[in-house]
Amino acid sequence: MFFLTDPIEDRAKDWLDYKINYQATFAAQLMYPAVDTYEVMPWPDRIYQGLYQVAGTDRKERIPRDYSTQMQIMVNTLNDIRTSETQVSGTHGIGVLMANSLMFQRFPDHDGYDDPQFSSFYGQTLPLLKRGIPVELVHMENTPFGDTFKGLKVLVMSYSNMKPMEPRYHDFLADWVRKGGALIYCGEDIDPYQSVLEWWNSNGNQYKAPSEHLFEKLGLDRVPAAGTYPCGKGMVTVIREDPKHFVLKSGNDRQYFDAVSAAYRKSAGKEVELKNSFLLERGPYTIAAVLDESVSDAPMELSGVYIDLFDKDLPVLTHKVIRPGEQGYLYNVKRISGRAKAKVLCGASRIYDEKAGKRSYSFVAKSPLHTTNASRILLPKQPIRVCVNEKEAVSYTHLTLPTT
């Protein structure tokens, strides 16, 4: 799997807006420790040569040097990112079911039914995410594989915004529930796509909605009322409301969240952890995000020795504050393993031909034209001379790192 983040967007916005969104999506992709392959710049010429609006003006210009420097620093770190067994902070084991057919129902308004801005999907995920739960995405097409349900305690699903392409998926879902899983079904099953000619209403099947087939497999009535039902060692909770209403109506997600909390308590034997942030360590990299519209307005405060990778100047910090609506991407210097060896820790250029001697360290740095190179270099001792292109550097900063 490759994750794609784009330093700009197709919609017409300004450079500042692009930068804010890029930081958010970049941090989000790093929150998946099982993925370490990325597409970093779709069509680089449009990023470096395109003209886009400057915030607060009608003027358009090419990418600001501050932003191109920061962008290149961020992209270069991906060369060092590896998969890891670490987990994002928070309660794990709560998932939301999705299927390929999600894309079949993108038409926003049909026969009096609408699902604006993918609201049914976000209605299932955002009430959990905004409370600090790292909700997992479970693909219906993967249910035949046993590892799909590994570690999963609660699974939320709805057929208001997608449909099962094959009836056999219901067998795997029902088997998981009977073995102890907690399934939460949200939906009124009234969208017009319920009546399209498909397997549940053809070839001898006479189900008015695919959920009727699922509930039958679970040993329930075809159209069960709202409530919680036992099923083998597990349980099924039915909420008769389309999940889009959990986000389209202010404060309307309480019943849904309470149902998820109760199911997790029953299945896992402990409470859901509520918080307003996410934190993940991947090697020396610290990725953090603090949420707005959450359970608290408190910022996240980190102490240590960090290089700020969202800052073009790569400042070394001993204290970092991340406020609601912001993200942080830091290089934790204290996590450097082994004895200190000369190396470029981070920077806005690609590094080639590194040569480390007993008293010297050299390398070739390459980056795009009309961009600024900034680097943080780790050395075992304080340098006597620093030369760039065989000329002594006029300006550089030297910091002695603490030994503890």
Regions found by a protein language model. Give the residues of each.
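A conserved amphipathic helix/loop scaffold
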Residues: 163-358, 375-377
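Conserved small/polar residues in nucleotide/adenosyl-binding loops
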Residues: 397-403
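Hydrophobic targeting/anchoring helices
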Residues: 1-121, 224, 237-241, 246-250, ...
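Short proline/glycine-enriched turn/loop motifs at strand-loop junctions of beta-rich domains
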Residues: 294-295, 368-370, 378-383
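A general structural detector for well-ordered alpha-helical segments in enzyme core domains, enriched
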Residues: 25, 124, 169-173
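Short acidic/histidine-rich motifs immediately flanking catalytic phosphotransfer sites
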Residues: 150-155
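Short strand-turn-strand beta-turns centered on an Asx-Gly dipeptide
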Residues: 387-391
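A short, well-structured beta->alpha microelement
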Residues: 127-147
